[in-house]
Amino acid sequence: FDGIIGAGGGFVQMGDEMLYHKKVSDEDVHRVVDFFETNHYDYYLESNGGLFASKNLIKRLESIIYGDLKNDPEARRKKEEEPSHFITALIENENMYRNDVNKICFLEHESIPFDEIRKQFCDAFQVIECTVPAFGDASGELSVAGVNKHTAIEALINHLGIDQKDTYAYGDGMNDAEMLTFVAHGVAVGNAKEGLKAIADEVCDDIANDGIYKNMKEHGLI
């Protein structure tokens, strides 16, 4: 198998073949963008064509990842010598009303609680809280309703004729919950959210300590 499950289960690609691809409808993209722009959210649209950033997103991410660029020489050094691959991948100044959106990720808003996002969009989206802890407790993502990593893995193993009992998955955030409960061996990494560890079959070492690699060696996968 040489492929990828991307966008939180939004698409499955094997080599050059796209097994399936679930995108956000144009109507729902407009709806979310209008809400986020009106309420001054920092967010980005994830698509197979790139990551498209809202107006002030990169400035805020630089503050989170590097620190105080204006007053701290060490922060400026980090930006110059150790640039974030995530930040450099973001595309600015593009039309956000796109027709190729897989999911939408947003940072925490200082005055709007996460429950308000759930209330606004739960009719059309799967609303997942705090998938990237650095983005804040009230951050999250909006993905196509009914689409997750479980559904993607199920479609893939059915296509390949692989038995579910032979499946393993590793996760760190709550958007991995359905995946870890579906596969036969669901493993949470040591730095995972506590809620994910609670439902995992096993907890391995942290990502920074090569937890996935070591666990795969233990299970004879590599």
Kindly give the residue locations of the regions a language model identified:
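Short, polar loop motifs at secondary-structure junctions
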Residues: 9, 110-112, 190-194
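Conserved acidic, metal-coordinating active-site core of Asp-based
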Residues: 50-168
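A generic structural signal for well-ordered alpha-helical segments
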Residues: 36, 118-121, 196
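Active-site phosphate-binding/coordination module
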Residues: 1-70
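Mg2+-dependent phosphoryl-transfer enzymes with acidic/Ser/Thr/Gly-rich catalytic loops
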Residues: 139-222
